[in-house]
Amino acid sequence: DSRIERIAVCRNKGIEIFKDKIKEFSIYIPMDLDLNLFKFVDIETFESLIDSFIDDNNAQGYFPFSFPYYYDIFALRKKGWVDGNALLNSFKLKRKFIIGAFIFNYIYIFSKQFKKEKFIEDLIPVESAFGGIGLYKVNNSIKYYELDKNDKYFISEHISFNEQFNYLFICRDWAIEAP
């Protein structure tokens, strides 16, 4: 079993349980419990972030920006930053060319791990992200991700889940520690 598969099973079970209990909309907060998500954020700051998210009529999802750099390239999709499946591209090239594995990892992964100072806006629009925790506005039409058993190591379950939402943002000032 892969970590991705375990995460997808947990997310799907949670959605199955609470989906019928949602009336208009609810806040859904999935999180990776194997990360220290609150090292840089106290409870008051997190509560304020949730309140700001609820009040933001344009947003359907908020995600943190990890420190010292954004690490979750696997779940990230943003034009000009990560346009496709960087991990899969790196893996395919490393299988063809044994020498130079670090170069492929650098090109497809490490060079995409930006620091928050690269961005001006407080809310960075993305097609998909995660980074250990997310805030979502959901209603009872929410669907869960069907894991493709053939691609379970190279497809982030967050990307398929995030396709249900139009306005997703990485919050520049919501910091978590990169693993």
Show where each model-derived region lies.
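Active-site-proximal specificity loops/subdomain of glycosyltransferases
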Residues: 1-25, 31
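Short, flexible/disordered intra-domain loops and linkers
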Residues: 1-4, 39-44, 149-153
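Alpha-helical elements of Rossmann-like donor-binding domains used by nucleotide-donor carbohydrate transfer enzymes
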Residues: 9, 13, 44-48, 160
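Short, high-confidence coil segments that cap the C-terminus of an alpha-helix
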Residues: 23-25, 56-60, 165
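A structural signal for short, well-ordered beta-strand segments and their strand-loop junctions
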Residues: 29-30, 61-64, 169-171
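Conserved catalytic core of nucleotide-sugar-dependent glycosyltransferases
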Residues: 35-138, 142-146
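Generic structural signal for helix capping and beta-alpha/helix-loop junctions
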Residues: 71, 177-178
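Catalytic donor-sugar/metal-binding loop of nucleotide-sugar-dependent glycosyltransferases
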Residues: 123-125, 131-142, 149-153, 158-177
